[in-house]
């Protein structure tokens, strides 16, 4: 029976770009080292925050190899593989090289808006061919469909290689319902930085974080404090990020965190269309907050 190995701080890695629009592989190397050196427990690559829909297959392959090479097995790697064409996702899983990868993150089918039974059958097909543990990804704000707790738990019970769900419904009631009814070998992972403190307090195993790209040390400390039951110092860290949580997403993701990383000197402030950089006023406000953070 597979066990969830994705606990603590997972960072949803951005993909840095140069001014000419090409992938900035040197900055990506530095960013991976920065994450590992500052408390990231695992890395999540080529998902939404990594702007994967705007990358070529060649770029995705090169990013995968780079992250594996820089990581050298120090932390776990979760790689995205999902879509709204079940057969295509199944074929991609069957035909991909998964060496050096520890798990697959797979989103609920978007745009099609399947029923709960359709969601179950989609993930059943994936689970039956996957050579690696699977983390489900429920994000209704992007997919247009919410996977209900009973569906999540049904999948978890029926397919032991489905080890967790990245839950980004925004509903703490839904999180509690999953945690209450899930099998013992299945975990809930926060997909929302702002709700991570509350979700871990309710029993979540960690987070796949956006803010962790820029502030992994402080965010991982908050999580570790919570795991030890030291809620007051953890709460102080959480509250210090309250305004930043909102600003990071006001102009879209990963525009906010890329602006923050640019301010820190890590990357150029570049995205690929249809995404554009965050507004100047938003960037300036985040810069002010960054300078005042006592972390």
PLM regions and their residue ranges:
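Active-site beta->alpha loop and helix N-cap motifs at the rims of alpha/beta catalytic domains
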Residues: 3-144, 154
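A general structural signal for well-ordered alpha-helical segments in protein cores
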Residues: 28, 60, 64, 89, ...
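Basic/polar N-terminal segments that are highly enriched at the extreme N-terminus
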Residues: 1-4, 291
């Amino acid at each position: 029976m597979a066990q969830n190995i994705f606990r603590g701080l997972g960072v949803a890695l951005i993909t840095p770009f140069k001014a000419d629009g090409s992938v900035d592989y040197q900055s990506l190397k530095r960013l991976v080292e920065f994450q590992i050196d500052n408390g990231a427990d695992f890395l999540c690559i080529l998902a939404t925050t990594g702007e994967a829909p705007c990358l070529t297959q060649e770029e995705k392959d090169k990013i995968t190899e780079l992250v594996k090479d820089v990581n050298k097995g120090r932390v776990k790697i979760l790689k995205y593989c999902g879509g709204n064409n079940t057969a295509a996702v199944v074929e991609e899983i069957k035909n991909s090289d998964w060496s050096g990868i520890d798990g697959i993150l797979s989103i609920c089918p978007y745009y099609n808006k399947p029923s709960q039974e359709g969601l179950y059958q989609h993930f059943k097909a994936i689970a039956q061919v996957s050579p690696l543990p699977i983390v489900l990804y429920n994000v209704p704000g992007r997919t247009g469909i919410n996977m209900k707790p009973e569906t999540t738990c049904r999948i978890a019970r029926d397919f032991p290689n489905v080890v967790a769900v990245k839950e980004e419904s925004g509903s703490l009631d839904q999180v509690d319902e999953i945690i209450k009814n899930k099998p013992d070998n299945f975990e809930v992972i926060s997909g929302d930085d702002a709700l991570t403190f509350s979700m871990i307090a309710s029993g979540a195993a960690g987070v796949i974080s956006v803010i962790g790209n820029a502030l992994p040390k402080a965010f991982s400390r908050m999580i570790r404090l919570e795991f030890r039951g030291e809620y007051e110092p953890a709460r102080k860290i959480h509250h210090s990020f309250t305004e930043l949580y909102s600003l990071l997403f006001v102009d879209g993701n990963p525009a906010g965190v890329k602006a923050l990383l640019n301010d820190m000197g890590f990357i150029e402030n570049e995205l690929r269309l249809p995404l554009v950089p965050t507004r100047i006023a938003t960037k300036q406000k985040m810069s002010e907050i960054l300078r005042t953070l006592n972390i």
